[in-house]
């Protein structure tokens, strides 16, 4: 299994910035790892077109569990696939907290992604209070149990909430231990780390 490096642009970027980034990526050449970029929805189709044939995959940052319907402002996994995405992030801590997304909601999104032919990246992570209490494995285990579709075999992103944008960095041993726990707990084929470095 090759290493996967994924970049989540969050709510940042413009066509000009995307074009400059793609030019830099093409100039850099092969880096010996799999690359995935997840720009805002408004840039996915352009990114997919510019990166076609480069080996750099393009993903969405979220999707709705329904394929279509009266869900103002939402984007379905089918729509992401239609504009060239191959992956989609679901259950990011910012969405779990800011939009009160439950494990069950994350599971439905992951199932929708799989049904649309996308590779879901299911995010899990503990808060600082949960880590201090020593309950991080119980928290992550419960998130995996609730968020992963039955028989899941795909990508899980471990994103300790306390290490996202805070400048706090977990030790390599802590990250490796959590990755081993996740791999042993579910059918994940890859585990990504998402947090401060």
PLM regions: where:
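Short beta-strand/loop segments at the ligand-binding rim of alpha/beta enzyme cores
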Residues: 34, 54-60, 119, 185-193
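Short beta-strands and strand-loop turn motifs
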Residues: 6, 59-62, 88-94, 121-125, ...
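Conserved N-terminal beta1-alpha1 strand-loop-helix module at the mouth
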Residues: 1-75, 145-152, 157
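Active-site-proximal loop/turn and secondary-structure-junction residues that shape catalytic pockets
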Residues: 11, 41-43, 62-64, 94, ...
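Glycine-rich beta-strand-to-loop/alpha-helix junction loops that act as flexible
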Residues: 39, 90, 158, 166, ...
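Active-site rim beta-loop-alpha module in soluble metabolic enzymes
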Residues: 116-187
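Glycine/small-residue-rich loop that forms an oxyanion/phosphate-binding "nest" at active or ligand-binding sites
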Residues: 52-112
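Active-site glycine- and acidic-residue-rich loops that bind
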Residues: 36-40, 68, 98-101, 130-142
């Amino acid at each position: 299994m090759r290493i996967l490096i994924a970049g989540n642009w969050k709510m940042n970027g413009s066509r000009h910035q995307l074009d400059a980034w793609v030019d830099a990526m093409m100039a850099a050449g092969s880096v010996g790892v799999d690359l995935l970029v997840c720009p805002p929805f408004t840039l996915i189709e352009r990114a997919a077109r510019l990166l076609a044939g480069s080996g750099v995959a393009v993903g969405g940052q979220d999707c709705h569990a329904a394929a279509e319907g009266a869900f103002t402002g939402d984007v379905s996994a089918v729509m992401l696939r239609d504009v060239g995405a191959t992956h989609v992030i679901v259950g990011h801590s910012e969405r779990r907290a800011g939009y009160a997304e439950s494990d069950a909601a994350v599971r439905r999104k992951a199932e929708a992604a799989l049904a649309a032919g996308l590779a879901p990246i299911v995010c899990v992570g503990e808060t600082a209070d949960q880590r201090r209490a020593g309950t991080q494995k119980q928290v992550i285990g419960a998130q995996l149990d609730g968020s992963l579709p039955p028989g899941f075999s795909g990508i899980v992103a471990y994103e300790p909430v306390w290490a996202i944008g805070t400048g706090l960095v977990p030790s390599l041993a802590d990250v490796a231990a959590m990755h081993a726990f996740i791999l042993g707990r579910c059918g994940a084929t890859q585990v990504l780390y998402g947090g401060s470095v």
